[in-house]
Amino acid sequence: MDIKKQTELIFEPILLPQDYKFELPENVEEIFINVASEVDLNGLYHKTTKSPLLLLYFQGNAKNMQNFLDNHSMILDWGYNVLVTDYRGFGKSTGMIDGEQNMYNDAEQIYDYALQLGYRPEDIILYGYSMGTSMAAYLATKKDAKALILESPYSSIAEIDIFGNQAPAYQLNTAARADEITIPTLLIHGEQDDVLPPDHSERIFANLQTQEKEMTVISKGGHGDLKSRSEYKESFNRFISNL
């Protein structure tokens, strides 16, 4: 299977017109980050004076930034700065994903953009949800950061039943990379996640090099409903307060 077909198999983008207007919460602005020639990633930046910390957030697979606003924007109310972008070909982002390294390179550019905003590495918490956990974990091995949070991660593409070994161009093997991660790490998974069962987190957790690691499995939690659970917020707050 060629890389174009592999890409189409894995990714589920929904485009938005360039003139699409988001209904943005207070203190949130729309941004574009140029990552390559004629490739600009659309994103949102939430600025607050309540904390110096930045959650550098990498989204899941399906849909686009509107999905973040509809289903995950509660993190904007947690008192932290937040930077989140769409992937190439998602939402209002231009270009197309054409390989795993392409995604990692974009993640590094987003990190560099955070530095340009004035954040120091020790201010940055790398935060990935679902597919975004691969980018967050990758950055944890390449860039300095305060901590890493992986919500509903997958250990590798090959370990996801619906993909198996059909997309060798996309390994996205966080479990294999975990032995290079040395910063404090929190994994959170839903007990009843029917997209990515908790054993994905267990494999990553077992391989982490850092000894400052925690894993929370939320009772009766699913794949996309964890942030609204009190157990999630308690685990998140405890982890941050101990950094």
How would you name each of these model-derived features?
Residues 1-34:
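An N-terminal hydrophobic leader/cap segment in hydrolases
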Residues 202-224:
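Catalytic histidine neighborhood in serine/cysteine hydrolases
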